[in-house]
Amino acid sequence: MAQLKQILQEMGSVIIAFSGGVDSAFLFKVASDVLGAAALGVTARSPAVPRNDLRDVEAFVKQFALNHEFIETQEVKSRQYRCNPTDRCYFCKEELFSRLHQLRKERGIAHLVDGSNAEDVGDYRPGARAARRQGVRSPLQEAGLTKDDIRALSRELGLPTWNKPAAACLASRFPYGTPISAEKLRKIDRCEDRLRQLGVRQVRLRHHDTIARIELLPEDFEIVLRHRDEITDFLKKEGYTYITLDLQGFRSGSLNLSLIHISEPTRPY
C-alpha cells in the first residue's frame, strides 16, 4: 500500500478509468485519499456496459463522495468493433482511452491510469495494447499488487467491492466473429438483469444466434430450474428459440478457450 501511495503522490493528478470493479474501485479510493480532488474517476456509458455495473458505480461514488464523471463512448459505431474480431477489445479500449486522454489534456491532468494489476497477463488482453498506445499507466501493476492483495486491502478499507465477482462488458457474451449491434447488447443486458432479479448472483448469457446459453455458479442452478418456465418465456420473447443451462457453470472468459493456442494478431498500431 505504501508503494502505491508513493506512486500516486508522485503523479500529482490522475484520471482513473473507473469501471466499478474490484481493481479500479480500490485504485480510485486510494488515489482520492492521496490526491483529493486531483483524482478524477471517469466511467464509460455505452450499450456494451451492463446497467447493473453503472448502478454499482453510482452507489460507490455516492458512498465515498468521490470526484467522478460519466462519458459516452461510441465503440459500437466502429465497423471493426461490430465485426467482433478476436482483438475486439482493442477497438473498445482505444475509443475509451483516446476520449479519456483528450479529457486529461483539456483538464490539465498529469496522468491517465487504469486498474490493471500484477496478474493481468494470463487471459487474452488486446485491450492492454491500446493502453500502451495511449500511454496509460497502471499503478497497481507498478506496485506489484495481485488480485488477492487488492481484495484484502479493499476489505481493510471497508470497500463494498472487496468480494465483488469478476465482470466483463456485454460484448464478451458473443463468440468471436458473431456481429455485434447496440440492440443485441441491450437484449443481453435485459436478459441478464431479469436473471439477477430472480436471485442469481453471477451470470453470463452467452449468445449463439437462436440459442441462449446461461452460465451460472453451480449453486444457483436450482434458482433457474425453479423459475424455468418464467425464464423460458422471457428469453423467447427476446428472440431466442432454445434456452440452455451450461452444466460446466460460470467461467470467466469461457469464449476465449478457443484462443488458448492462438497468439495475438500483429497489427501495425
Residue ranges and their predicted role:
Residues 1-156, 197, 212, 230-240, ...:
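ATP-dependent adenylation/nucleotidyltransferase module used to activate substrates
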Residues 146-152, 159-168, 201-203:
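Short, structured loop/turn "capping" segments at alpha-beta junctions
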Residues 207-217:
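Short, aliphatic-rich beta-strand segments
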Residues 260-269:
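Single conserved hydrophobic/aromatic residue that forms the stacking wall/gate
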Residues 182-201:
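Short amphipathic alpha-helix segments
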Residues 201-208, 246:
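C-terminal boundary motif of the adenylate-forming
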Residues 221-226:
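Short, conserved charged micro-motifs
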Residues 164-182:
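Internal, active-site/partner-interface "lid" segment
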